């Protein structure tokens, strides 16, 4: 065994002072001295439990002792009588075995592959032991869940990721998916429960038993977000629901995740075999599938962007050449050829590497280097985490922990360890790039073209200097360009850039100037880009991105030239520069029905318990998607209707995620309202009004929302801190508002306006569905019924959605006096015009002035309220374009008039979108849109003025 290094020998004196009673420096073995000096986790544990140290001193841990874990845990749980004592014993057992593993790992008593196996078996043993105890307890309370034939149904648990692969790291969280075989009901209990309810309750108790922090700590952080539909989906799914999802909706990244899926406590019974057989075709295709390479490349790009966003330097998992890249290399071959080559279907990485070598899919030397690098990195990761039982993959910055790792990795000192690490990661990166990398590089022609611009950049020409490369610009433009460059250089002198930053900037600027100054609008474009550059000069990562990826630089210039809104967004949030790397996604926004799934995948990389990071991630995702929508808008690939569709679907995905976060936080605090025990769903709905309800969001639109619940009176929550059920929903709505409006470094998510709720700002923030119906029928004003025309549920379970739709239909199909309605709608519009109309007499306010967008909206709303009692189909849609279509189809409005109003409406909205992209107000010269305005005014007179 390697003697302790000098810094660690000095630290040992600190350890001696903390030794438990009965142990002295002379009474301890050299092995104990080494472990307790290396790991604060081990030291703290034996201080609390001195008998563990005595046990380890008398008999060292063995390589195959994982075979005894299940028996040891069974003994530990023999006296458990309730959930609290179960949680205590699970935590005690986990800590005791983890100390044994840390001891064996630190002293290299067991090889590194076996350590990974022990960590994985420990987790599996604890999961299965907790599940089995809780299953029996739940059966005693509610009966045994059975299928219609009376066959008892088990809870099956899929371990995902490193747990599934038998490669768990020391302080890992665990990714799980819960499933049960067939629908049915419980039998033999005090009352019958549907199987879905039984297994949901069992799943919730199991997560609590493992995940909830107590005075004894926790067992594992449990992450359930890999299940179908993520946090918004059921906690536990039947086999049939799982099969439907993966056949019809399973995404590429879910396929990759499922490669490592393994049943916990698999005893190879009929249910287990059925589940494995069901999932296999989804994971391994019968044909050779080369689409995998691009998908994995995209995933790696997402991770690289995450590393930049979160400033994850020295990260041995996610960094270039890290553990994740080795996993990607192996998965490429599994997913391309696994359907044809059974040897590639292993869940574990090292056996799969052996299969890759046997099939000659990679050179022997590459496979050997990957194996050595993987074991090196995994040992380093485990040692790093075992110091404090902390989930981290970032190398330490302090001398003590660096000395610990150097000793644990058998290096002479920290620089030697870093040198070995650098070599291993370089080998991994080389193989990765050869296989799925796509680095760009400058061509010789581009270098030659940019060379003359070095003089312009580096020689700091004055505005009256002449240079051949600027000769094509007009005098004023040339002066502006030189002034902008000079001012930018002066600004740089005030910034702590550092030598590497200046070097990258000197490489970048000639290329940037060559591209910008070839444009007619060079001065304007440069004036938009220099603030962005000034914002990132101290963040070398982003300068390198623009320097190393010429395509990204070209897209930056094009987008900034086209839109000051995009330029200012990029300047404010430089992390958006990552989106410029892939033109395939930049100009092709996410499919309208895929925003929820994209967001779910994005949030999976953020710890569920880290609220601050979750808030940042939501805002960053929204900004990236807005950029892609705007880029497609500028490129002309999205018409105005589609722009609003995308902005609306994006907002709905955000609402879904925010409600989920708020719900999780509230349930953790109070439990959920007890009436939900008897029904599916959450008893909560979010209704979108205005532009959101009408599928007409713009780039900077706020969200008009109201919140509904269906909680009866006198219902309490079922958590340890009981509160009234209606109070729960009020706090939930307040939490949602808070999550939307909290300002982080990435800004707010959306401005939310909840004043359209019953009684406006004076009313309750959240309303029961019955109270909402009563208000609409007996108290609401006509303008509130107009608003209801453009309202729809944007989040909610089917029961509440149907209830809201029925109320909306009832209100809109109520017969009204035509003359009274006409007067009320017209007078409301005149009040709005007086209050909001354009104050610039020589300008036309596209939205608020006569003949503008609001007039068209009022015409549509008036006609729906006027005629829906005769033509109920008019209530079907909440957006103006389809309402106009319905009016024509139902004979209310002439088809030619409806078509003309639709064209006018989309034309005016298109102009508003493009004014927003130019950061201009929503008014234009009076001479603009005269034809459209005349047409709208004629229609207004026909419907709302004529007697």
UniProtKB/Swiss-Prot annotation:
Residues 450-947 are annotated as: Adenylyl transferase. One of its GO terms (biological process) is regulation of glutamine family amino acid metabolic process. GO terms for molecular function: [glutamate-ammonia-ligase] adenylyltransferase activity; [glutamine synthetase]-adenylyl-L-tyrosine phosphorylase activity; ATP binding; magnesium ion binding. It holds the Pfam family GlnD_UR_UTase. Signal peptide: none annotated. It catalyses: [glutamine synthetase]-O(4)-(5'-adenylyl)-L-tyrosine + phosphate = [glutamine synthetase]-L-tyrosine + ADP; [glutamine synthetase]-L-tyrosine + ATP = [glutamine synthetase]-O(4)-(5'-adenylyl)-L-tyrosine + diphosphate. Residues 1-440 are annotated as: Adenylyl removase. GO terms for cellular component: cytosol. Keywords: ATP-binding, Magnesium, Multifunctional enzyme, Nucleotide-binding, Nucleotidyltransferase, Transferase. The keyword Nucleotide-binding applies. Transmembrane segments: none annotated. Its cofactor is Mg(2+). SUPFAM superfamilies: Nucleotidyltransferase, Nucleotidyltransferase substrate binding subunit/domain. Its EC number is 2.7.7.89, 2.7.7.42. Gene3D superfamilies: 1.20.120.1510, Beta Polymerase, domain 2, Glutamine synthase adenylyltransferase GlnE, Nucleotidyltransferases domain 2. InterPro entries: GlnE, GlnE_rpt_dom, NT_sf, PII_UdlTrfase/GS_AdlTrfase. Involved in the regulation of glutamine synthetase GlnA, a key enzyme in the process to assimilate ammonia. When cellular nitrogen levels are high, the C-terminal adenylyl transferase (AT) inactivates GlnA by covalent transfer of an adenylyl group from ATP to specific tyrosine residue of GlnA, thus reducing its activity. Conversely, when nitrogen levels are low, the N-terminal adenylyl removase (AR) activates GlnA by removing the adenylyl group by phosphorolysis, increasing its activity. PANTHER family: BIFUNCTIONAL GLUTAMINE SYNTHETASE ADENYLYLTRANSFERASE_ADENYLYL-REMOVING ENZYME, GLUTAMINE SYNTHETASE ADENYLYLTRANSFERASE. Belongs to the GlnE family. This is Bifunctional glutamine synthetase adenylyltransferase/adenylyl-removing enzyme. The gene is glnE.
């Amino acid at each position: 065994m390697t003697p302790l290094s000098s810094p660690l020998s000095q630290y040992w004196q600190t350890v001696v002072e903390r030794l438990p009673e009965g142990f002295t420096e002379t009474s301890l073995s050299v092995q104990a001295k080494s472990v307790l000096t290396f790991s604060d986790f081990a030291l703290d544990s034996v201080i609390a439990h001195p008998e563990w140290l005595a046990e380890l001193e008398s008999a060292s841990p063995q390589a195959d002792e994982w075979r005894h874990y299940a028996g040891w845990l069974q003994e530990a749980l023999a006296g458990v009588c309730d959930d609290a004592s179960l949680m205590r014993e699970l935590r005690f057992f986990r800590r005791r075995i983890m100390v044994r593993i840390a001891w064996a790992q630190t002293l290299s008593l067991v090889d590194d592959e076996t350590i990974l196996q022990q960590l994985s078996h420990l987790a599996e043993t604890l999961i299965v032991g907790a599940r089995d105890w809780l299953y029996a307890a739940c059966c005693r309370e509610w009966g045994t869940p059975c299928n219609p034939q009376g066959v008892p149904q088990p809870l099956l648990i899929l371990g995902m990721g490193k747990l599934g692969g038998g490669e768990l790291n020391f302080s890992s969280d665990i990714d799980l998916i819960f499933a049960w075989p067939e629908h049915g009901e419980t039998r033999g209990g005090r009352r019958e429960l549907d199987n879905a309810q039984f297994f949901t309750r069992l799943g919730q108790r199991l997560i609590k038993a493992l995940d909830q922090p107590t005075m004894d700590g926790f067992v594992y952080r449990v992450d359930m977000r890999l299940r179908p539909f993520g946090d918004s989906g059921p906690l536990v799914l039947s086999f049939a629901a799982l099969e439907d999802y993966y056949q019809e909706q399973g995404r590429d990244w879910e396929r990759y995740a499922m490669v490592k899926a393994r049943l916990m406590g698999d005893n190879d019974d009929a249910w287990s075999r059925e589940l494995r057989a069901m999932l296999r075709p989804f994971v391994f295709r019968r044909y050779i599938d080369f689409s995998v390479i691009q998908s994995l490349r995209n995933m790696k790009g997402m991770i690289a962007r995450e590393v930049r966003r979160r400033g994850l330097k020295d990260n041995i998992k996610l960094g270039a050449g890290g553990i994740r890249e080795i996993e990607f290399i192996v998965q490429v071959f599994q997913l391309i050829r696994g359907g044809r080559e059974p040897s590639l279907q292993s869940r574990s990485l090292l056996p799969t590497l052996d299969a890759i070598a046997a099939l000659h899919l990679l050179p022997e030397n590459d496979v050997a280097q990957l194996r050595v690098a993987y074991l090196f990195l995994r040992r380093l990761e485990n040692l790093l985490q075992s110091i404090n039982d902390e989930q981290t993959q970032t190398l330490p910055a302090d001398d003590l922990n660096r000395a610990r790792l150097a000793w644990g990795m058998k290096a002479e000192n920290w620089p030697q360890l870093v040198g070995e690490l650098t070599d291993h990661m370089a080998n991994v990166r080389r193989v990765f790039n050869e296989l799925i990398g796509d680095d760009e590089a400058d061509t010789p022609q581009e270098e030659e073209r940019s060379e003359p611009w070095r003089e312009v950049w580096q020689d700091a020409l004055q505005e009256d200097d002449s240079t051949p490369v600027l000769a094509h610009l007009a005098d004023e433009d040339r002066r502006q360009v030189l002034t902008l460059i000079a001012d930018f250089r002066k600004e740089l002198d005030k910034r702590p850039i550092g030598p590497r930053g200046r070097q990258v900037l000197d490489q970048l600027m000639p290329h940037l100037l060559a591209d910008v100054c070839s444009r007619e609008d060079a001065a304007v474009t440069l004036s938009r880009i220099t603030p962005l550059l000034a914002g990132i000069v101290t963040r070398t990562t982003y300068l390198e991105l623009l320097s190393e990826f010429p395509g990204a630089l070209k897209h930056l210039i094009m987008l900034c030239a086209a839109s000051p809104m995009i330029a200012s967004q990029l300047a404010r949030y430089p992390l958006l520069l990552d989106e410029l790397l892939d033109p395939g996604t930049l100009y092709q926004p996410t499919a309208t029905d895929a925003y929820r799934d994209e967001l779910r995948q994005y949030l999976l990389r953020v710890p569920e318990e880290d609220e601050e990071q979750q808030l940042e991630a939501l805002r960053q995702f929204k900004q990236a998607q807005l950029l892609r929508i705007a880029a497609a808008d500028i490129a002309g690939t999205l018409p105005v209707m589609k722009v609003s569709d995308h902005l609306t679907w994006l907002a709905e995905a955000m609402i879904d995620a925010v409600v989920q976060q708020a719900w999780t936080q509230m349930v953790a605090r109070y439990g959920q309202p007890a009436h939900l025990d008897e029904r599916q769903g959450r008893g909560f709905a979010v209704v979108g009004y205005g532009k959101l309800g009408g599928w007409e969001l713009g780039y900077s639109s706020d969200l008009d929302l109201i919140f509904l619940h269906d909680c009866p009176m006198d219902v309490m929550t079922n958590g340890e801190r009981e509160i009234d059920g209606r109070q729960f929903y009020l706090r939930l709505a307040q939490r949602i508002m808070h999550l939307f409006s909290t300002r982080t470094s990435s800004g707010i998510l959306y401005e939310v306006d909840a004043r359209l709720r019953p009684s406006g700002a004076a009313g309750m923030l959240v309303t029961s569905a019955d109270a909402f119906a009563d208000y609409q029928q007996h108290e609401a004003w006509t303008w509130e019924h107009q608003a209801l025309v453009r309202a729809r549920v944007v989040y909610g379970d089917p029961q509440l959605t149907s209830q809201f739709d029925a109320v909306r239909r009832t209100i809109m199909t109520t017969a009204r006096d035509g003359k009274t309605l006409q007067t009320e709608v017209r007078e409301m519009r005149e009040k709005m015009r007086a209050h909001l109309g354009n104050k610039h007499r020589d300008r036309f306010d596209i939205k608020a002035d006569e003949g503008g967008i609001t007039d068209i909206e009022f015409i549509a709303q008036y006609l729906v309220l006027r005629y829906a009692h005769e033509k109920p189909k008019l209530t079907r849609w909440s957006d103006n374009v389809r309402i106009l279509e319905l009016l024509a189809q139902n004979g209310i409005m002439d088809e030619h008039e409806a078509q003309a109003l639709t064209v006018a409406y989309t034309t005016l909205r298109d102009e508003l979108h493009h004014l927003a992209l130019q950061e201009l107000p929503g008014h234009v010269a009076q001479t603009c849109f005269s034809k459209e305005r005349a047409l709208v005014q004629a229609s207004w007179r026909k419907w709302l003025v004529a007697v």
